[in-house]
UniProtKB/Swiss-Prot annotation:
Chain span(s) of sequence motif LIR 7: 335-339
PANTHER family the UniProt entry points to: CRYPTOCHROME, CRYPTOCHROME-1
Annotated region (Required for inhibition of CLOCK-BMAL1-mediated transcription), positions in chain: 371-470
Annotated motif LIR 9, positions: 395-400
Protein name, entry field: Cryptochrome-1
Ranges spanned by the short sequence motif LIR 2, renumbered to the chain: 82-87
Motif LIR 10 boundaries: 411-416
UniProt cofactor(s): FAD; (6R)-5,10-methylene-5,6,7,8-tetrahydrofolate
Induction description: Expression is regulated by light and circadian rhythms and osicllates diurnally. Peak expression in the suprachiasma nucleus (SCN) and eye at the day/night transition (CT12). Levels decrease with BMAL1-CLOCK inhibition as part of the autoregulatory feedback loop.
Source domain of life: Eukaryota
Organism: Homo sapiens
Activity modulation notes: KL001 (N-[3-(9H-carbazol-9-yl)-2-hydroxypropyl]-N-(2-furanylmethyl)-methanesulfonamide) binds to CRY1 and stabilizes it by inhibiting FBXL3- and ubiquitin-dependent degradation of CRY1 resulting in lengthening of the circadian periods.
Listed GO MF terms: blue light photoreceptor activity; DNA binding; double-stranded DNA binding; E-box binding; FAD binding; histone deacetylase binding; nuclear receptor binding; phosphatase binding
Region Disordered, annotated ranges: 552-586
Length: 586
């Protein structure tokens, strides 16, 4: 009997740097590449039309690239546990390959499939290629616990073995001795479905701002590297109005779906840096996006409650308000704050927003204004954001809501001043909120302050054509900062440790978040609504009080707390999330 192999695509939707697929092909007589439409995407999450379209485009591109190798993609609907026993028998499978999935749900699913494969006499190949590092080795190096500060994480990876270079792309030469059995009715049986076939109404759906697939990902990577003039002097580009728009060099959705190998990106950045800097060693900060990604993957891999507040050993238990009406206004871009509403409109229309825009809307929903749980915001991002990833999405929301990682609860984004500083003319607002197009720049971020005559000229009456602000930002943010302060002081007293949480004497110093203060942001009061400060809590691993704390319900931080120095400005202003550092993706 010949060697009949199957490679199961999940993430990792590419032919370049795919070690599991490459090894699966070696020595095989037949190869079938399958994608099962269910596990995470169609099953457990509410996924919006833009994300589905991106996935289907990825699958279409993968199928097109496999066709060039006289192969095809087999798209199969169902649950993996039901599908594979049938395929093992029907195709006489002897070998199955998969890319390692570090997320708890994925590990549980894969363990079940490996058990079924073993029972059927099928060899299973698992290789790491969605992350740069073996996350278990990072945790082992840290005494069995995931590092919960980025600085500690950097220290650990600096001790790791050098990264392996990407494996060669699957080409006709690689696959030449391996055939794919195909039938005339392949498209009917195994073709990539359309959005309509999946039940989506596509009337009025605009063209994709982010086309899915490996081909597009590699094109963008080359463009991305070409415009990296910042590498020469290693300076970050300054944020401006254009930064808020989708870039033809953006990479985050492609890394999330594995259309682009993170290792390829890493080594391309390294090569470019060495070329410009004459072979000097690149700093870790060059890889900002990739390393923050690894940081959150590492924190989440052994924590099935990572996306929940309750029962999550690294998350502070905060008594958030339940307010479905306010949540809906935020999610649908009806807050009455043009900056927030424009961001949420862009997210719903295009499936992507700039990382600092993510900071603004996350702060507004949680600790800044509405005091609604980060879990609710995370679910909205999971539905709408192309690059939403279970580990990174949950980690970002915990961080931005001051529920875990770095706590900086005095730092609050002003929903008027932050946007005005970024885009003084208001072009971004006019693009996504055309109802406000007629307002002059002076009032476009706070149109409720415009005299009635100006509102009439703009053909937009506040409270009629566009909503009034749903909250008083100055009052809400001041109240919420006090709430957060009390939570951390209570936690600090309970733990018998001091808490560093005070407004610095120099409000315009460079240690503040984005360097903003109440005094230098128009539209923000100086009484705390945008004040800078430090609420940093550093973690010391190996705390024996974890179980006791969980039972007490005060906190489920899971690690010791100690007052510490502020992070460096580089660390302090890192953007967290699927798009995680300014110089890395756009």
């Amino acid at each position: 009997m010949g060697v009949n192999a199957v490679h199961w695509f999940r993430k990792g939707l590419r032919l370049h740097d795919n070690p599991a697929l490459k090894e699966c092909i070696q020595g095989a007589d037949t190869i079938r590449c399958v994608y099962i439409l269910d596990p995470w995407f169609a099953g457990s999450s509410n996924v919006g039309i833009n994300r589905w379209r991106f996935l289907l485009q990825c699958l279409e591109d993968l199928d097109a690239n496999l066709r060039k190798l006289n192969s095809r993609l087999f798209v199969i609907r169902g649950q993996p546990a039901d599908v594979f026993p049938r395929l093992f028998k029907e195709w006489n499978i002897t070998k199955l390959s998969i890319e390692y999935d570090s997320e708890p749900f994925g590990k549980e699913r894969d363990a079940a499939i490996k058990k079924l494969a073993t029972e059927a006499g099928v060899e299973v190949i698992v290789r790491i290629s969605h992350t740069l590092y073996d996350l278990d080795k990072i945790i082992e190096l840290n005494g069995g616990q995931p590092p919960l500060t980025y600085k500690r994480f950097q220290t650990l990876i600096s001790k790791m073995e050098p990264l392996e270079i990407p494996v060669e792309t699957i080409t006709s030469e690689v696959i030449e001795k391996c055939t794919t059995p195909l039938s005339d009715d392949h498209d009917e049986k195994y073709g990539v479905p359309s959005l309509e076939e999946l039940g989506f109404d596509t009337d009025g759906l605009s063209s994709a701002v982010w086309p899915g697939g490996e081909t597009e990902a590699l094109t963008r990577l080359e463009r991305h590297l070409e415009r990296k003039a910042w590498v020469a002097n290693f300076e970050r580009p300054r944020m401006n109005a254009n930064s808020l728009l989708a870039s033809p060099t953006g990479l985050s959705p492609y890394l999330r779906f594995g259309c682009l190998s993170c290792r390829l990106f890493y080594f391309k950045l390294t090569d470019l840096y060495k070329k410009v800097k004459k072979n000097s060693s690149p700093p870790l900060s060059l890889y900002g996006q990739l390393l923050w990604r690894e940081f959150f993957y590492t924190a989440a891999t052994n924590n099935p409650r990572f996306d929940k507040m309750e029962g999550n050993p690294i998350c502070v238990q905060i008594p958030w308000d339940k307010n479905p009406e306010a949540l809906a206004k935020w999610a649908e871009g009806r807050t009455g704050f043009p900056w927030i509403d424009a961001i949420m409109t862009q997210l719903r229309q295009e499936g992507w927003i700039h990382h600092l825009a993510r900071h603004a809307v996350a702060c507004f929903l949680t600790r800044g204004d509405l005091w609604i749980s980060w879990e609710e915001g995370m679910k909205v991002f999971e539905e709408l954001l192309l690059d939403a990833d279970w580990s990174i999405n949950a980690g970002s929301w915990m961080w931005l809501s001051c529920s875990s990682f770095f706590q900086q609860f005095f730092h609050c984004y002003c929903p008027v001043g932050f946007g005005r500083r970024t885009d003084p003319n208001g072009d971004y607002i006019r693009r996504y909120l055309p109802v406000l197009r007629g307002f002059p720049a002076k009032y476009i971020y706070d149109p409720w302050n415009a005299p009635e005559g100006i509102q009439k000229v703009a053909k937009c009456l506040i409270g009629v054509n566009y909503p009034k602000p749903m909250v008083n930002h100055a009052e809400a943010s001041r109240l919420n900062i006090e709430r957060m302060k009390q939570i951390y002081q209570q936690l600090s007293r309970y733990r018998g440790l001091g808490l560093l949480a005070s407004v610095p004497s120099n409000p315009n110093g460079n240690g503040g978040f984005m360097g903003y203060s109440a005094e230098n942001i128009p539209g923000c009061s100086s009484s705390g609504s945008c004040s800078q400060g430090s609420g940093i809590l550093h973690y010391a691993h190996g705390d024996s009080q974890q179980t006791h704390l969980l039972k007490q319900g005060r906190s489920s931080m899971g690690t010791g707390l100690s007052g510490g120095k502020r992070p460096s400005q580089e660390e302090d202003t890192q953007s967290i999330g699927p798009k995680v550092q300014r110089q890395s993706t756009n």
